[in-house]
From Swiss-Prot:
Keywords: Disulfide bond, Plant defense. One of its GO terms (biological process) is defense response. This is a cyclic peptide. This is Cyclotide mden-J. Pfam families: Cyclotide (PF03784). Disulfide bonds join 5-21, 9-23, 14-28. It comes from the Eukaryota. The presence of a 'disulfide through disulfide knot' structurally defines this protein as a knottin.
Length: 31
């Protein structure tokens, strides 16, 4: 939840979810 993954998730889910990133406030974050 604190480290930005450099990916937005406004229109599509986080592709980076495979490495533990999750959508928060339209941006993908890790932890």
């Amino acid at each position: 939840g604190s480290i930005p993954c450099g990916e937005s998730c406004v229109y599509i889910p986080c592709i980076s979810s495979i490495v533990g990133c999750a959508c928060k406030s339209k941006v993908c974050y890790k932890n």
